[in-house]
Amino acid sequence: MSDSLPTLSHLDDSGQVRMVDVGDKADADRLAIARAAVRMSPQAYGLLTQPGQGKGEVLNTARVAGVLAAKRCAELIPLCHSLPLAFVGIEFSLDDEGHRVEIRATCRTRYKTGVEMEAMTACSMAALTIYDMCKAADKGIVIEQVRLAYKSGGKSGEWRND
């Protein structure tokens, strides 16, 4: 197999699952930004965004859940390394036309491996928390477009998902 072809880093030469050995890698500044969206019915979105109905409580709870999920990522994803997070930030924007809550998670570290999984886990858990807190008003809520939007640092450098 050529070195220029992509490989699955969590499989060894015989195809067995393995944790990537990062022991000899140098620490580097690393940043990852992930995005997700939660789409719901106009009625549920109206309840979420109506003044006095708890938008702040729902989004603040989702924010804390996202931060906690990033911190626990290595316990949730079997081959993830535990790493020292320097920062986790969760931001929300409201799409009134699409009845969506858009989520952006940013994770930062100085370590031997990246924080992409932490950022995507943070986004996913924030989205699940919004679902949980709004499901009484809409069982058909959809979590969509969980994705890595940006990463920097390490051997592969900067990458954008435009």
UniProtKB/Swiss-Prot annotation:
<dbReference type="InterPro" id="IPR047594">
    <property type="entry name" value="MoaC_bact/euk"/>
</dbReference>
<comment type="function">
    <text>Catalyzes the conversion of (8S)-3',8-cyclo-7,8-dihydroguanosine 5'-triphosphate to cyclic pyranopterin monophosphate (cPMP).</text>
</comment>
<comment type="similarity">
    <text>Belongs to the MoaC family.</text>
</comment>
<keyword id="KW-0501">Molybdenum cofactor biosynthesis</keyword>
<dbReference type="InterPro" id="IPR050105">
    <property type="entry name" value="MoCo_biosynth_MoaA/MoaC"/>
</dbReference>
<protein>
    <recommendedName>
        <fullName>Cyclic pyranopterin monophosphate synthase</fullName>
        <ecNumber>4.6.1.17</ecNumber>
    </recommendedName>
</protein>
<dbReference type="GO" id="GO:0006777">
    <property type="term" value="P:Mo-molybdopterin cofactor biosynthetic process"/>
</dbReference>
<dbReference type="InterPro" id="IPR036522">
    <property type="entry name" value="MoaC_sf"/>
</dbReference>
<dbReference type="InterPro" id="IPR023045">
    <property type="entry name" value="MoaC"/>
</dbReference>
<feature type="binding site">
    <location>
        <begin position="79"/>
        <end position="81"/>
    </location>
    <ligand>
        <name>substrate</name>
    </ligand>
</feature>
<dbReference type="GO" id="GO:0061799">
    <property type="term" value="F:cyclic pyranopterin monophosphate synthase activity"/>
</dbReference>
<feature type="active site">
    <location>
        <position position="132"/>
    </location>
</feature>
<comment type="subunit">
    <text>Homohexamer; trimer of dimers.</text>
</comment>
<keyword id="KW-0456">Lyase</keyword>
<dbReference type="Pfam" id="PF01967">
    <property type="entry name" value="MoaC"/>
</dbReference>
<feature type="binding site">
    <location>
        <begin position="117"/>
        <end position="118"/>
    </location>
    <ligand>
        <name>substrate</name>
    </ligand>
</feature>
<dbReference type="InterPro" id="IPR002820">
    <property type="entry name" value="Mopterin_CF_biosynth-C_dom"/>
</dbReference>
<comment type="pathway">
    <text>Cofactor biosynthesis; molybdopterin biosynthesis.</text>
</comment>
